[in-house]
Every structure is written in C-alpha cells, then in structure tokens.
Amino acid sequence: MYGVLQVVMRDTSLLDGLTKEDCVSISGVIEHRDEETYNPKIPTGTIELEAHSVEVLGRVYKQVPFEIMTSKETREDVRLKYRYLDLRNKKVKDNMIFRSQVISFLRQKMTEMGFLEIQTPILCASSPEGARDYIVPSRKFKGKFYALPQAPQQYKQLLMVAGFDKYFQIAPCFRDEDARADRSPGEFYQLDFEMSFATQEDVFKVGEEVLSATFEKFAPEGSVVTQAPYPIISYKQAMLEFGTDKPDLRNPLRIIDLT
C-alpha cells in the first residue's frame, strides 16, 4: 500500500536515537481508529498502525536546510538547490500531482476526439523560430551539431504528408530565451496538435472544446468558469482596442481613437 498512514507509538522508547527526517521502517499491528479521530480526507483515515518496532533505513547526519512543511517561505535559490526536499512539501507536491492529472485528462480528451499521440524526435536539425537554438555536439560526426526542437513544427507537418491526419503530443520545447511570466526559461511543455485539411475554424473548435472541458474539470470549487463558445477577436482589433495581441478581456478598459 502507498500513501499516508497514521502511526501510534505507545512505547516511547522506540523514538530513542531518532532524529528529524530520518527514514524509518515501522512494523506493528493495524488497528481501527477511534471514530472521533477518523480522517475522511485520506483512504487510510479509519485505521492506524500501532508500532512495535522501528528500523532506521537512512539516518540524517546533518540538519536539513529548511523546514519541509514551510519550504515555500524559504529563499527560492535554496529551494531549487534542494528541490528533492522542497517537493516533499504538500503544497508543492500537490502542484506536481495536479499537473499530472491535467496532462492525463488532455491525453484522454484528445484521444476521444480522434487524435493519435506520436512523439517526434528530440535531437534534430536546426529550424530556427522565435528564439536561439540549444545546440548538442555530435560525438560521431566531429564539428556537427544537433539542435533541440523549439517546437515539433516540421515533424508534425511531415506526419500529415504521411497520412496521420490527426496528431497530438505533450511536446517538450527548448528555446534559449529569457524567462517569461507564463513559462520557465529554456524549456516548457505544450499541447501540440495538427490536422490535415483543417480550416482556422476547425482548429478553434478543437482548442475551445479541450480548454472548456479542462477548465470545467479542474477549476477550483465555487469558481466561475467561462462557458464556450469563447469570443473571437481579430489581431487588428486586439491591437487597436487593447494595445496587445493577448488582451485580458476581463479588463473593461479600451483604447479609443478620438482623432
């Protein structure tokens, strides 16, 4: 069984010699909890382990660099240096679990819509887009280099030529560019898809259906989710009215030409 289980130690001598964050193996007897101590938030919330013996599997010899449960209050550079400890913080761990659930749902949704998931190559020829390439030297061919893909653009178009009329993948993209507010520097993942003989409206429809279903499923309880169909505005209208190509339509302010 994997997960969280409450342990009760009636023999406090079992704690002798233990230090905080030691990794231990505990043997004992599974018992029912008292009803007033039930925890409905976890699958094991009605049982507990009465410890009979404790074996230290991995001892902590140095003080951990920060308190695990409050790691989000620690300086970011320290958290990143000890990322494996930071990920033990429940709030941080929940982010990883949430990401996994969203990706799993996206795969399910795209498959239901008739798309085929295909992984395209990571080591490829350079095809510059909007940023600099990450270059990987070839061991076999001296003086030659691979590039990490900024996007799987060429490969997915070749898949259309090959007769795979609906493709998708959760694609890793590598771009040597500065950090942005909505993605980390260097690499990010995107839902990438392509369809043969599709119109702009066909692409909008797929995107709208996937986004709508995803937000509907994962939006926090009680939050307001914008229902499809979503408003569509042209690039020209966005620039003239908002001064940006990705406006926040919740903002009621508009640019008005009075000349």
What are these regions (language model features)?
Residues 1-259:
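Class II aminoacyl-tRNA synthetase catalytic cores and aaRS-like
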